[in-house]
Regions:
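Conserved small-residue
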Residues: 1-202
Length: 202
């Protein structure tokens, strides 16, 4: 079987406006050459905010102690790159592979739904696509790995509400939807945190 891979650290998947041109950058390029990038070139506001949240999460993870001083942050900003973020991406590149067989990005390898699997098609990848009237993507056109990565981010950050199909072997979807009610409002918050008994009652 072919060993498919699409690593978000090295593969271009983020649309940007750089030096007056429409381009696609990888995470590594985005952080390595930030001064040439004017802005994210994404029309969909959900995708744009989702990518911004990912970029912030990477920055905070790479610099858990923050910057030594405002002057230090200014020097890095003027230099146009932050080596600590680049090093972080290289160290954790294996966790950014969209198609990894063991640790796919923002997914669980081998996870299957309860019951018989269903093919929901393209629309489930993006909350805005739930109503075909408003979708801007041809549902019969294959989705590129870059598009799938952006839609996966949106789906993880802005998933639609409602009851979702549970994972095979997980009892929670069947048993966790019943709220515990107490005699008083504070007990409503306390009861779900208890193990067996609270206030002498099961």
């Amino acid at each position: 079987m072919a060993n498919h891979s699409f690593n978000l650290v090295t593969e271009p998947w983020i649309p940007v406006l750089a030096d007056g041109k429409h381009e696609s950058h990888s995470l590594e390029t985005l952080f390595d050459q930030p001064t040439s990038i004017r802005q994210l070139d994404i029309a969909d506001p959900l995708e744009r905010v989702s990518i911004m949240r990912l970029l912030l999460a990477i920055m905070y993870a790479a610099r858990q102690e923050g910057y030594s001083s405002p002057a230090g942050a200014k020097r890095i900003m003027e230099a146009g790159r932050d080596q600590e973020i680049i090093d972080y991406l290289h160290a954790w590149a294996h966790r950014f592979d969209l198609m990894s067989e063991t640790e796919p990005f923002l997914q669980v390898a081998g996870m299957m739904p309860q019951g018989k699997p269903k093919d929901y098609g393209f629309t489930r990848l993006h909350p805005a696509m739930q109503r075909p009237l408003w979708q801007t993507h041809d549902p019969y056109k294959p989705v590129t790995p870059a598009e799938a990565a952006r839609m996966l981010l949106v789906c993880n950050m802005y998933d639609v509400a409602g009851v979702h199909t549970g994972m095979a072997g997980d009892r929670k979807p069947r048993e966790a939807n019943v709220p515990h009610r107490g005699w008083r409002r504070p007990e409503d918050s306390l009861l779900p945190s208890s193990t067996e008994t609270t206030c002498g009652r099961p």
